[in-house]
Amino acid sequence: MILRHVCLTSALALGTALPVQAEMVFNRIATFATPQNMAEGEDTARESSAEIISASDDGMTLVYTDSPLGVVGLVDITDPRAPKALGTIAMGGEPTTAHFAGDKIVVGVNTSESYTNPSGKLVTVDMATRSVVAECDLGGQPDSVAKAPDGSFVAVAVENERDEDVNDGAIPQAPAGFVVKVALKDGLPDCAAKQVIDVTGLADIAPEDPEPEFIDINAAGEIALTMQENNHIVVIGADGTVASHFSAGAVDLDGVDTKRDGALNFTGKMEGVLREPDGLRWIDNDHFMIANEGDWNGGSRSWSIFRKDGTLVYEDAGALERAIVEMGHYPEHRNKKGAELESVEFAVFDGVPTGFVVSERASVIGVYDLTDPANPVLKQILPSGISPEGIVALPARNLLASANEVDLREDGLAPAHVMVFERAEGTPAYPMITSAGTEALIGWGALSGLVADPEAPGMLHAVSDSVYRSAPTIFAIDATQKPARITGATVVTRDGAPAQLLDLEGITNDGEGGFWLASEGRSDRLVPHALYHVNAKGEIKAQVALPPELLAVEQRFGFEGIAKVGDVLWMAVQREWKDDPKGMVKLLAYDIKEKTWGAVHYPLDTPAEGAWMGLSELTVHGDWAYVIERDNQIADKAAVKKIYRIALADLKPAALGTELPVVAKQEVRDLLPDLVALNGYVVDKVEGFAIDAAGQGFVVTDNDGVDDSSGETLFWSFGPVQ
């Protein structure tokens, strides 16, 4: 099954592909891991998070909520390229939102003992002393808190959230939510004069149980409120009474992936999907934008702009999600709500009304020119950390900051992060590879092996691994463009159907227009270690299984690269198998004509404590074989991501079962500096390396199909290879 695509040009694709006059763009300039904010002597292995984020009036300090630790965290961004930890302040509960109010910080804190007996407080912290100076009882569980632009009051969305384990999470579930309005004087709340605003009886869905979710205030002092599970929006006037309210409505979606089946298939339809908005931001005194995340029965994979009278001005209808697909960030494992657009932000940068839309599951931020609210223009998509929850714009400093909530260190993965972006003249650094511009939408991800066209410089092919087990695919890449372009996708087939039980980790040319593919086996999932010969259409023409000698000693970590030298296929085995000495892995040789096997041993670097070392690619160019050797560590724990070379003359395989010769290796390049070039954290899986016909080296990382990953794919050339 083969898909050939004619390249077209979209506004976003044109802006990133062709040389244009320099314009103002956002690029990431710093990353701050939340464990850095823990004090000396604290258990830094504890779960930490960065959820909702805001900035001081001068834009020099960020505050974020960290609910697992029950604190708010502070970050000094006086130098935005070098954020500094300012520590945390305990809240005596679960902080939900924090805002600066002059030299104070006001924080919504959830203190509920149960869903049926919710409670919470509005806490005020004096920044000079870092002490709590006031607390207001809110009478329920707070979610979002907003501060009026003039600093005169705050409004709190008291959600009194539902218990999802009761009646399958259906509402109504008492008690009902409401809104609290509290005046501020010198940053201190006037608790005695707080106003409780009833929003029952408004929604069509469970009107007796409003579930306020997100709240924002415009320059006129009007409050806009999303009630997510109720699929309703409420506008409260400056006098504290309901001025208007309306259903958030529904969206029809076409060309979406509707099944979680290990394949990217954008041909489905979803009709009448409730928006169920989460985040909301006023654009001006008449319009606001919403992110239609969904939480109960909806989630329309879109964002919208409404007038405050309920008139729909703009509906994205999945356009941002399609752009996310082109970037390789579509989270196939979360299909119901797709990319799950969570929150929004708005600010005016140098006279340009600019909207930001955050995708929680795709871990990206869409940047829009909202000069005409009826016709937003997508300008960029920025990479963020894993599961961005909150975002704050600082237009006076040309900065943007995101709070990324998921901490995966318990699984050996990345911590939660705050990321800082700067708006400056230049070109977008990300994406580095995209399928934008094709006639039909090409979804992709988990690029795990790379090979160059033997004749055309800059032309490459890559394979996807078992994340997309139902549609293993070979991608054609044009790396002469910037960003590199995926121009075609060929599904690997067996007997006319997408081949099953493959985990493609290596690809090499067969010299006849087809490819040899290396599949990493996993016996506990019935996936065999094997080699596959496919033609240009992706049809499997031959399969080579492991011989008994190797099957007897195989383990999970198998083939991670393949290269062809004459009639011999060479494969890198990622980690030691049962018969390998510690620190030695096999480079396996298979003679295609003689149908015989042999091997040599490759010496691995010594891993740090708690880490393992392995190979993740093998390619041949000139008189050398090149491998990627890496540890399995990520972020600040990553220590080894390197390219080594072995002289082909030394690749003299011995028979299996005999003592294997040990080859000598030479370091070619340390990839760690390349992996932080975009000012993010170091990803663990550097998986593909190829040298093109002009001798240029290309590297690609595996984004794990955006599963427990930010989805970032780094693709770059470091120039001529020695």
What does each model-found stretch correspond to?
Residues 1-22:
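Gram-negative bacterial Sec-dependent N-terminal signal peptides
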Residues 23-722:
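Sequence/structural signature of beta-propeller domains
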